[in-house]
C-alpha cells in the first residue's frame, strides 16, 4: 500500500528571525510565525490526510493547530519528530558558531548527530508504514529533522545532493511517499508564495 507523508516545517520564531540555533529549546511561534501559519492554512486545507502528528515543541504544535483548525482530528505528539538537539549551541547565533562542529560523527558539543536525527525520523515513518492502515498523514516537524531525513535518502541513492540553506522555509510543505519498499521525495519546501 502506498503511503503519503505531508511534512510541514513549523512557522517562524523570534530565534529563526535572529538566526539562532533552536534545537530542542521550546521557542514559541512569533507573531510573524502565527501569521505565516494562517496564510499557509488554505494550502493545507486542500490536502486530504487521515492523521495529524506533531513534534512536542510548542512551535510545531501551534503550527499544527492553526493549519488544521477546521479538521476534526486529534493532533498526536511524537518525540521522534522533534528537532535535532544542538547542545551547547542552542541559543547561539548561527554566524558565531563553527558549523563544521555540528557535522562530525561524535559530537562533543552535547548535541545530536544528524544521522541519528534522520534515523529516528525514519523510524517514526517506518512505524506508520508497517503498523498503521491509514494512507495520508500530516506531520508538523522541523527543518533540521525533515532535512536530515531527506539527506539520508539521497545518500542511500548515491546522490551527493545537499539541501541548500533556506530550502525548507517556515510553514513549507515537503511531500514524501512510500511505495514498493522505498521512500521517494516528491516535493521539497513548497509554499504558495
Regions found by a protein language model. Name each.
Residues 186-193:
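Short, solvent-exposed aromatic-acidic interface loops
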Residues 5, 135-144:
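Generic beta-sheet signal
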Residues 6, 76-78, 186:
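General small-molecule cofactor/ligand-binding pocket signal
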Residues 8, 12-71, 112:
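Active-site-proximal alpha-helix that buttresses catalytic centers in soluble enzyme cores
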Residues 46-48, 128-135:
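Glycine-rich phosphate-binding loop signature in dinucleotide/nucleotide-binding domains
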Residues 69-123:
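Phosphate-handling substructures
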Residues 157-184:
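Domain-level recognition of soluble alpha/beta enzyme cores
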Residues 54-55, 119, 140-141:
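Short beta-strand scaffold positions
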Amino acid at each position: 500500500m502506498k503511503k503519503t507523508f505531508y511534512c510541514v516545517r513549523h512557522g517562524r520564531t523570534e530565534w529563526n528571525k535572529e538566526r539562532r540555533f533552536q534545537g530542542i529549546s521550546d521557542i514559541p511561534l512569533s507573531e510573524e510565525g502565527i501569521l505565516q501559519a494562517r496564510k499557509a492554512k488554505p494550502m493545507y486545507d486542500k490536502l486530504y490526510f487521515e492523521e495529524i502528528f506533531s513534534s512536542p515543541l510548542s512551535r510545531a504544535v501551534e503550527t499544527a493547530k492553526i493549519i488544521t483548525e477546521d479538521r476534526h482530528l486529534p493532533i498526536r505528539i511524537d518525540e521522534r519528530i522533534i528537532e535535532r538537539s544542538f547542545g551547547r549551541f542552542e541559543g547561539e547565533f548561527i554566524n558565531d558558531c563553527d558549523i563544521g562542529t555540528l557535522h562530525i560523527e561524535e559530537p562533543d558539543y552535547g548535541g545530536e548527530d544528524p544521522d541519528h536525527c534522520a534515523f529516528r525520523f525514519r523510524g517514526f515513518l517506518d512505524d506508520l508504514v508497517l503498523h498503521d492502515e491509514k494512507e495520508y498523514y500530516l506531520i508538523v516537524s522541523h527543518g533540521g529533522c525533515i532535512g536530515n531525513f531527506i539527506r539520508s535518502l539521497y545518500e542511500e541513492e548515491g546522490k551527493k545532493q545537499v539541501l541548500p540553506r533556506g530550502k525548507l522555509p517556515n510553514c513549507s510543505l515537503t511531500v514524501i511517499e512510500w511505495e514498493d519498499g522505498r521512500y521517494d521525495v516528491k516535493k521539497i519546501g513548497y509554499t504558495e508564495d
